[in-house]
Amino acid sequence: MRYEYVPLKDQYEKEIVPALMKEFNYKNIHQVPKLVKIVINMGIGEGSRNYDLIERHANELAKITGQKPIVTRARKSISNFKIRKGMPIGLKVTLRGARMYNFLYKLINIVLPKVRDFRGLDPNSFDGRGNYSFGLSEQLVFPELNPDEVRRIQGMDITIVTTAKTDQEARRLLELFGMPFKRG
């Protein structure tokens, strides 16, 4: 296994762990919350009828994350949405390890500042178990994508899964990573 420099992982080990141990009075270093994975989900409504659209968005998601996405399929038929069981309805990527830290670094420092009318992430989007979810309305904010090649603007949901027991611990962990939450 080759060594890869991951700036956020170094920051976590050298700065964030000691700060959280002091702030929450942890006795053991293993009690400190850490990132487990980042899941990026892109729901494609018309994709069930247009396989070219799924391929195009899969390539975009692969460029953004550096990992090939999985096609998610409908679990049951819903006639109102014209969906049958087994039809492709979206794409999903799960990032762990170095790719996860690099994606988070890119998200915090490059992508979120490029979002139009961005005033910070909603601090109330935690799920009660220390996980944070938010959505991006378009994929063009990622530097890997050329706006001329993108045919259809598509949003995505991003979920950051942590080992934190409470939302307060998870929020503090993400704040120390540099996540821009709304003040107030």
Swiss-Prot record:
PROSITE patterns: RIBOSOMAL_L5. GO terms for molecular function: RNA binding; rRNA binding; structural constituent of ribosome; tRNA binding. The keyword Glycosyltransferase does not apply. Keywords: Ribonucleoprotein, Ribosomal protein, RNA-binding, rRNA-binding, tRNA-binding. Pfam families: Ribosomal_L5 (PF00281), Ribosomal_L5_C (PF00673). The keyword Repeat does not apply. PANTHER family: 60S RIBOSOMAL PROTEIN L11-RELATED. Belongs to the universal ribosomal protein uL5 family. This is Large ribosomal subunit protein uL5. It comes from Thermotoga maritima (strain ATCC 43589 / DSM 3109 / JCM 10099 / NBRC 100826 / MSB8). The gene is rplE.
